[in-house]
Amino acid sequence: MQTKKNEIWVGIFLLAALLAALFVCLKAANVTSIRTEPTYTLYATFDNIGGLKARSPVSIGGVVVGRVADITLDPKTYLPRVTLEIEQRYNHIPDTSSLSIRTSGLLGEQYLALNVGFEDPELGTAILKDGDTIQDTKSAMVLEDLIGQFLYGSKGDDNKNSGDAPAAAPGNNETTEPVGTTK
């Protein structure tokens, strides 16, 4: 009889351990729920998506309103095209809204931040519908580029003179003579 009780307790413990392992796996896979809410699809094209991945969150002010459904390469422009699945209850997003790739923390995962624009029928703005494209996008900031800008003082402009010697100070028209010569 005592052996039967021990077997039941071991079975309960194993079942609890399996449920805990399943919970951890779902959290690690970033699965928020088993049920699916109705969504609509939006598209956006970026110059550089960095480490953005499918299933990355789309948020407005820190609140997750959707997910990245797919990332493909546009066959005409060869730019990354991101497909977004936005929850249907957030269906009043103006077409003046912008989308930027951000990183949670210094080296955390990347997500899409949706900055809601303004709606003004007199200016011809509209609400984004299923299948529309967000025009105003800001690409991911690449850590190596930021470090390079900091180290070399670049402001993001093209570095066509980066290997040139520094120019003479204005008003200094003095020329240098080789050593051993006199003026």
Curated annotation (Swiss-Prot):
Residues 1-7 are cytoplasmic. Residues 155-183 are annotated as: Disordered. GO terms for cellular component: membrane; phospholipid-translocating ATPase complex; plasma membrane. It is a single-pass type II membrane protein. It comes from Escherichia coli (strain K12). This is Intermembrane phospholipid transport system binding protein MlaD. Belongs to the MlaD family. It is found in: Cell inner membrane. The complex is composed of two ATP-binding proteins (MlaF), two transmembrane proteins (MlaE), two cytoplasmic solute-binding proteins (MlaB) and six periplasmic solute-binding proteins (MlaD). Interacts with MlaC. GO terms for molecular function: phospholipid binding; phospholipid transfer activity. GO terms for biological process: intermembrane phospholipid transfer; phospholipid transport. Part of the ABC transporter complex MlaFEDB, which is involved in a phospholipid transport pathway that maintains lipid asymmetry in the outer membrane by retrograde trafficking of phospholipids from the outer membrane to the inner membrane. MlaD functions in substrate binding with strong affinity for phospholipids and modulates ATP hydrolytic activity of the complex. Residues 172-183 have a biased composition (Polar residues). The lineage of its organism: Bacteria, Pseudomonadati, Pseudomonadota, Gammaproteobacteria, Enterobacterales. The keyword Signal does not apply.
